[in-house]
């Protein structure tokens, strides 16, 4: 074997590896005073009572730094206690506390080996080494009333009270719980302390009664990692893995927290901000995250939903913090960075929030808050939120308003405590009572199942009765379209007499007819004299120069009509006057038999033309609407067209007319696509969406759910979901359930289903009854034993799914995404390494 090279370097220590970790190349942030790299991972810091020295402890680290009188300059290392002796060189420290009073020259540390060490800073030596804990000591604390009393919290679940002058511990407190994570003396009660445990329990003890705690608090749903008293001892803050900070009243024995602050990630440290002369910081505290977030959030308990300030100056997880003063915060991270920041100059999260917001009230009114629209008031606000740039669109708008007069101005620096708040206004947008009544009436009476033609007919009747003009036009046009497209083999003379929706022939329910009788009577006083016009009266040759000549001319047959229309230009009567119905007023004239034909014709044409491709088609369709068809008589202009839309042939005829209105068009008649029902329905739903009529669009979508609607599925699902939300908001839960069942949307049914379990079928053959029962037992055991998703490896929560046979469990969203996003041609295999179970082709499940 070749000889070992003697020049090979020795294996580096953890401290050396930590010192070479990758750090950001960026400089200090604007609110950061200084940064010190101690070349090792930092676990804890502690400052002496005179605030002239600070102890820094961590993995193979215990240094003493001298604090510079000028707070803007970094501290300087004056002693490295671990390097003074070979016996203590590789000691690691989980926590450090500086002694007070007669022990002001002593530093107390605890180690992962279960030791309590006492160091003399002046001698730079280890004085005492206590070892009574069987497992690691996580935290320690020193009494401010008895400087020789030290408490230690250990992984073995014990809390021990030490007098460092004695050779062993004085009292042992058994909490009958899991590991003890933190312990802290009360700053106001000399004999009380609080201990935090892995079980989420906080226990308050009196050192005079060591057998049982005098108060137990079910504080968190997971491990409690830190507890901290406010400077005056009134409040107690706790944080843990459940991503919450809880504030407790330490002066009472109440077992309910006063305030709960929710964070986006698990928390490992919380520190109360000291109060200044105006007691500004008495209600504020800082917190840091255990994983996932390197920022420090400063919270004000009077506003627990958004941080007061956010400090982002570390590239690694923040391990500990300490308030050097009311304005200065010291923080340390796992990569060995010790930093000082000025909190008031840090990033203000409130400036990121939009100044306008809205929400539904309990009375179904829309409540909104926004800035008053006043240029004079907005331009008078000359402020920024922090030294961070590009914070919000609001700030950009303010600067733009200030510079609109042509002058240039720089942003004004942030002035702590003196900024001007932007005034806001609150408003309530309530429904009109008639709109709510109309919506509820239609929602309860609309028919979205059964025979399609009857449903459209009845829905048009209901819409007409309550004065819903647009909804009536929609349903009547659909009913007319169904009659046209389903009777294409009949002649025009038969289709002209298709009954339209009226109060006399649309409903079989006599009771509803009697209740709405006053709304269904059609006035005959304003019936025009041209009701009995024939089809021939609507078209005539263009050579007609006078009204009298036009009225006398006619087309004798359908062939002549087709020829006249295809070879000559005509004039189309464009009905665009809105139909307005007053509350309680029956429809007159505009809702007559003739106007109904015009409504149908309009939607048939729009649906036909909107689904043709090609620029020339669109241009011809537009020219058709302007004036490109055969000229009509004055009599026909007064009447509302068209009987030609009453048949399949008339629909194709109008379609040909729209495409051949341009004299330059040479599209063969035989190549023209026919009008189909999906085109009409798609056009109508699009029109309803553009008008914001959610109810009509959703009901049309449900009635014609068997059709292939040419709209994105996600848009239709969003439409149906919006209507379901409206129904539930008004308490119509049965109607919402019916809509979900009749919508034909798998996504909507899945979202609102009571059971969302997704079970993957297997390629293996079906197991027998005994095998299935055994597999079911195994799966039940697997559910209770596994605690992580097989795909994302995060704790199992919410809806869980598993493939039968193998029983590997994961989150429904994870496995669904993995299964359906797989683009390989081969059968998907269970994501668990080594499982090898093949699933059925997903195309068979879609």
UniProtKB/Swiss-Prot annotation:
SUPFAM superfamilies: RING/U-box, WD40 repeat-like. Residues 541-560 are annotated as: Disordered. Residues 544-555 have a biased composition (Low complexity). WD repeats lie at residues 88-129, 132-172, 175-215, 219-258, 262-309, 313-348, 624-663. GO terms for cellular component: cytosol; GATOR2 complex; vacuolar membrane. Pfam families: WD40, zf-RING_16. GO terms for biological process: positive regulation of macroautophagy; positive regulation of TORC1 signaling. Keywords: Repeat, WD repeat. InterPro entries: WD40/YVTN_repeat-like_dom_sf, WD40_repeat_dom_sf, WD40_rpt, WDR24, WDR59_RTC1-like_RING_Znf. CDD domains: mRING-H2-C3H3C2_Mio-like. PANTHER family: GATOR COMPLEX PROTEIN WDR24 (PTHR46200:SF1). This is Uncharacterized WD repeat-containing protein C4F8.11. It comes from Schizosaccharomyces pombe (strain 972 / ATCC 24843).
């Amino acid at each position: 074997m070749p000889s070992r090279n003697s020049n090979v370097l020795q294996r580096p220590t953890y401290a050396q590896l930590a010192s070479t970790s990758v750090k950001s190349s960026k400089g200090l942030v604007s609110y950061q005073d200084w940064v010190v790299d101690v070349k090792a991972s930092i676990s804890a810091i502690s400052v002496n009572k005179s605030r002239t020295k600070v102890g820094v402890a961590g993995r193979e680290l215990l240094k003493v730094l001298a604090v510079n009188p000028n707070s803007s300059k970094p501290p300087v290392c004056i002693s490295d206690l671990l390097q003074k002796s070979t016996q203590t060189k590789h000691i690691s420290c989980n926590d450090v506390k500086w002694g007070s009073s007669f022990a002001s020259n002593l530093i107390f540390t605890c180690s992962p080996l279960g030791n309590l060490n006492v160091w003399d800073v002046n001698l730079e030596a280890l004085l005492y080494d206590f070892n009574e804990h069987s497992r690691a000591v996580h935290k320690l604390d020193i009494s401010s009333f008895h400087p020789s009393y030290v408490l230690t919290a250990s992984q073995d679940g014990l809390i021990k009270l030490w007098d460092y002058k004695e050779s062993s511990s004085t009292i042992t407190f058994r909490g009958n719980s899991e590991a003890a994570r933190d312990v802290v003396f009360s700053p106001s009660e000399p004999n009380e302390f609080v201990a935090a445990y892995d079980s989420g329990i906080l226990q308050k003890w009196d050192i005079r009664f060591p057998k049982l705690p005098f108060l137990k608090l079910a504080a968190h749903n997971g491990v409690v990692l830190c507890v901290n008293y406010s400077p005056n001892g009134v409040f107690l803050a706790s944080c843990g893995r459940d991503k919450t900070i809880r504030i407790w009243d330490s002066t009472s024995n109440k077992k309910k927290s006063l305030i709960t602050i929710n964070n986006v990630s698990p928390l490992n440290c919380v520190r109360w901000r000291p109060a200044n002369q105006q007691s500004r910081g008495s209600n504020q505290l800082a917190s840091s995250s255990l994983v996932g977030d390197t920022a420090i959030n400063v919270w004000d308990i009077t506003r627990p939903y958004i941080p007061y300030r956010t400090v982002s100056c570390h590239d690694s997880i923040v391990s500990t913090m300490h308030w050097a003063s009311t304005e200065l915060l010291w923080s340390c991270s796992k990569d060995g960075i010790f930093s000082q920041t000025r909190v008031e100059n840090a990033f203000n999260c409130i400036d990121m929030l939009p100044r306008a917001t809205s929400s539904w009230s309990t009375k179904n009114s829309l409540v909104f808050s926004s800035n008053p629209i006043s240029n004079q008031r907005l331009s008078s606000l000359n402020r920024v939120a922090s030294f961070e740039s590009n914070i919000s669109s609001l700030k950009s708008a303010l600067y733009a308003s200030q510079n609109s007069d042509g002058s240039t101005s720089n942003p004004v620096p942030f002035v702590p405590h003196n900024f001007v708040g932007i005034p806001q206004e609150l408003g309530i947008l309530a429904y009109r009572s008639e709109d709510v009544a109309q919506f509820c009436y239609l929602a309860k009476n609309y028919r979205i199942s059964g025979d399609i033609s009857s449903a459209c007919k009845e829905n048009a009747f209901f819409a007409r009765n309550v004065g819903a003009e647009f909804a009536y036009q929609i349903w009547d046009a659909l009913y007319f379209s169904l009659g046209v497209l389903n009777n294409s083999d009949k002649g025009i003379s038969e289709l002209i007499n298709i009954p339209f929706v009226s109060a006399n022939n649309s409903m079989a329910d006599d009771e509803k007819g009697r209740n709405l009788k006053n709304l269904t009577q059609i006035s005959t006083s304003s019936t025009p004299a041209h009701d009995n016009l024939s089809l021939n009266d609507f078209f005539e040759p263009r050579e007609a120069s006078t009204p009298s000549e036009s009225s006398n001319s006619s087309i004798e047959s359908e062939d002549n009509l087709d020829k006249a229309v295809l070879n000559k230009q005509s004039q189309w009567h464009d009905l665009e006057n809105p139909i307005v119905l007053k509350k309680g007023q029956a429809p007159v004239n505009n809702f007559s038999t003739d106007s109904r034909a015009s409504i149908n014709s309009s939607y048939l044409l729009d649906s036909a033309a909107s689904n043709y491709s090609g620029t020339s088609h669109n241009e011809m369709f537009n020219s058709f609407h302007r004036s490109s068809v055969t000229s009509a008589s004055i009599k026909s202009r007064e009447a509302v067209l068209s009987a030609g839309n009453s048949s399949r042939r008339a629909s194709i005829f109008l379609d040909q007319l729209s495409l051949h209105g341009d004299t330059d068009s040479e599209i063969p008649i035989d190549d023209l696509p026919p009008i189909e029902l999906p085109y009409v329905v798609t056009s109508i739903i699009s029109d309803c969406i553009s008008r914001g009529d959610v109810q009509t669009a959703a009901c049309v979508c449900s009635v014609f759910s068997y059709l292939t609607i040419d709209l994105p599925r996600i848009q239709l699902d969003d439409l149906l979901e919006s209507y379901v939300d409206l129904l539930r908001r008004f308490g119509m839960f049965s109607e919402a359930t019916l809509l979900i069942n009749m919508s034909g949307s798998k996504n909507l049914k899945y979202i609102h289903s009571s059971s969302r379990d997704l079970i993957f079928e297997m390629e293996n053959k079906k197991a027998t009854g005994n095998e299935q029962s055994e597999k079911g037992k195994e799966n039940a055991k697997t559910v209770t034993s596994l605690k992580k998703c097989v795909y994302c490896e995060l704790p199992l929560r919410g809806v869980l799914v598993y493939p039968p046979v193998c029983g590997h469990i994961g989150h429904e969203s994870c496995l669904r995404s993995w299964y359906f996003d797989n683009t390989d041609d081969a059968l998907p295999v269970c994501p668990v390494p080594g499982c090898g179970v093949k699933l059925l082709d997903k195309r068979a499940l879609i």
